Design a protein with these regions (language model features):
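N-terminal active-site segment of His-dependent metallophosphoesterases
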Residues: 1-51
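Active-site environment of divalent metal-dependent phosphoester hydrolases
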Residues: 2-5, 40-43, 64-76, 127-130, ...
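Divalent metal-coordination and catalytic microenvironments
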Residues: 20, 32, 37, 67, ...
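Short glycine/proline-enriched loop/turn "hinge" motifs that connect secondary-structure elements
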Residues: 24, 111-114, 185-186
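His/acidic metal-ligating clusters that form di-metal
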Residues: 27-30, 118-120, 133-231
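Extended active-site neighborhood of metal-dependent phosphoesterases/phosphodiesterases
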Residues: 49-163, 195
Length: 231
């Protein structure tokens, strides 16, 4: 089960928690994934502790990644990361310190001794100036060091299994190819009877095209999961 975006807004998201309670009780997921912006508040410390305690209370493994708003309050991402790692049911790891971001980690789903699925959690950072002459900041992107780490990890998992292993990527800021794919899908009429929901705002991707360097037959990535459910 996947959630994202302002799960706790200024510590006052009781209606959101009620909705999450209902969904978790009904669906009984094996894993809860938070694809960024768990909190968005000036006083992040209070909101983070409240949100972590709530999600951890379900007794279900859960895996968060950072969004572009999590670190905007009165505590930084390193403090939040430590709190994630202290939570009993949270699978979050800060990840290697020699690549970009906090929270690049992998969840391997096993069947006996074989890894049958790898869930790749990646930090897409927040925002940056793309050029020294930029007047405005733009959404950030996955760094080259992260892509190399991803390739190294997947190749290692494939070697361990002695076969190609399916994998999925979870991230917060979308890559621009998602907007291209969505626009083409709309031009072709969508999928009547299958597509549903409300698109409440425009896409907010980075400007850096990266999917070709991250997706290949040898790496066997199946899907890239973005913040698609905002409640």
């Amino acid at each position: 089960m996947q959630f994202n975006d302002a799960l706790d807004l200024c510590g006052k998201a009781d209606n959101v928690y009620e909705t999450v309670d209902t969904l978790v009780t009904k669906q009984k997921p094996d894993l809860i994934v938070i694809t960024g912006d768990l909190v968005w508040a000036k006083f992040t410390k209070f909101s983070v502790i409240k949100a972590i305690n709530k999600i951890d209370s379900y007794g279900i493994p859960w895996a968060p990644i950072n969004g572009n708003h999590d670190g905007e309050g009165n505590v930084d991402l390193a403090w939040i990361a430590n709190k994630y790692e202290e939570a009993e049911n949270c699978l979050f790891k800060q990840g290697p310190d020699n690549i970009g971001g906090i929270g690049n980690y992998i969840i391997n789903i096993r069947e006996n001794d074989k890894i049958v699925q790898s869930l790749i959690m990646m930090d897409t950072h927040a925002s940056r100036y793309y050029d020294k002459d930029d007047e405005n900041m733009h959404y950030d992107f996955i760094f080259d060091s992260q892509i190399e780490w991803y390739k190294w990890a997947i190749n290692g998992i494939n070697e361990y299994n002695n076969s190609k292993t399916d994998s999925m990527i979870f991230m917060h800021i979308p890559i621009p190819e998602f907007k291209t794919a969505y626009d083409l899908w709309q031009q072709e009429g969508g999928a009547e009877g299958e597509n549903f929901g409300i698109k409440g705002e425009e896409e907010c991707p980075s400007y850096i095209i990266q999917v070709c360097s991250m997706q290949s037959r040898s790496l066997t990535v199946q899907n890239m999961y973005l913040p698609v459910m905002t409640i």
